[in-house]
From Swiss-Prot:
Protein name: Diaminopimelate epimerase
GO cellular component: a single term: cytosol
Listed GO MF terms: diaminopimelate epimerase activity
Alphabetical list of InterPro entries matching this protein: DAP_epimerase_AS, DAP_epimerase_DapF
Keywords, alphabetical: Amino-acid biosynthesis, Cytoplasm, Isomerase, Lysine biosynthesis
Biological process annotations from GO: lysine biosynthetic process via diaminopimelate
EC category: isomerase
HAMAP family reported for this sequence: DAP_epimerase
Gene of this entry: dapF
Lineage: Bacteria, Bacillati, Bacillota, Clostridia, Natranaerobiales
Binding site for substrate: 11, 63, 73-74, 211, 229-230, 239-240
Subcellular location(s) per record: Cytoplasm
Family under the similarity heading: Belongs to the diaminopimelate epimerase family.
Length: 299
């Protein structure tokens, strides 16, 4: 069985065509960095040609612990970049179905923000980037969802929770999967991130768990972020998380809907359109290598 290894800002994935297996178990084995290939997640994809799905392809993403994610921004960029180069596609635009809806992606070249934001140093900025319409974020407590009473229709902004390191204020946003965004004066030491990440991920407030982002506001268009991903732990980048960060920063008055998000693995440009309220993510995706699995891995 052939596979591709790709990454988006160091958030790495194994891409495989759908072949009807126990994917949660396979993801745990293949993503293991000591006894498997090693990755943050497993992406399974298939063509929608002979289906009733109104998209070109569909994808499912499994985290390294075997859990399934609704959507992954870095993974969909990787898949789009791979499909555009290797499969029969209609130009550089694709519609990819996910469990969080159909996402429209586009391969872009000579990306220019007309001087609005300096993206110098973006990984892959001199090559093709991938633009993804991430659709509208969900902000109401009932939509994310949160385990709260009486205020299910409120915007979940600056909600306090108590932790071993004191009180942190969360702004919750769903950009497919749920995210808890926390604004801090300084980014966390690694030891603190490794302890706080799982505490917030599994907090009773989130019935299905949550991704966690710690954010330092450098300027109105520059946000530095640390990521703790639900089901994967500390990672170098999170695309849906970068989108959630810009939404949270906007509703809290830190930016105006457009910013680049600096993650440990590199930068993403995020635009939350004022007119349509839709989110757009632009960033790189890189092919690492191709490989073939020994059939014994399936038994």
């Amino acid at each position: 069985m052939k596979f591709e290894k790709m990454h988006g800002l160091g958030n790495d994935f194994i891409l495989m065509k759908d072949f009807q297996r126990n994917y949660p178990d396979l993801a745990k084995r293949l993503c293991d960095r000591r006894f498997g290939i090693g990755a943050d997640g497993l992406v399974i994809y298939s063509s929608c040609k002979n289906s009733n799905i109104n998209a070109d392809y569909q994808m499912r993403i499994y985290n390294s612990d075997g859990s399934e994610a609704e959507m992954c921004g870095n993974a969909i960029r990787c898949l789009a970049k791979y499909l555009a180069k290797t499969e029969e596609t209609d130009g550089k635009r694709l519609a990819i179905a996910t469990t969080a809806g159909i996402k429209r992606v586009e391969i872009v070249e000579n990306f220019d923000l007309m001087g609005e934001i300096n993206l110098s140093g973006m990984v892959g900025s001199q090559e093709q980037l991938v633009k993804v319409n991430m659709e509208k974020p969900l902000l109401k407590s009932s939509d994310i969802p949160l385990a709260v009473k009486n205020d299910r229709n409120d915007i979940a902004r600056q909600r306090p929770i108590d932790t071993p390191y004191g009180i942190y204020y969360l702004t919750e946003v769903s950009t497919g999967p749920p995210h808890a965004v926390i604004f801090v004066q300084n980014l966390l030491p690694e030891e603190q991130l490794l302890e706080l990440g799982p505490i917030i991920e599994k907090h009773d407030l989130f019935p299905y768990g949550t991704n966690v982002e710690f954010v330092k506001v450098e300027s109105s268009n520059h946000l530095r972020v640390q990521v703790w991903e639900r089901g994967a732990g500390k990672t170098l980048a999170c695309g849906t998380g970068a989108c959630a960060v810009v939404v949270a920063a906007t509703i809290n008055g830190f930016c105006n809907g457009m910013a680049y998000v600096e993650l440990p693995g590199g930068k993403l440009f995020i635009n939350w359109d004022n007119n349509t309220e839709e989110l757009y993510m632009i960033g790189p995706a890189e092919h690492v290598y191709s490989g073939e699995l020994n059939n014994q891995i399936f038994y």
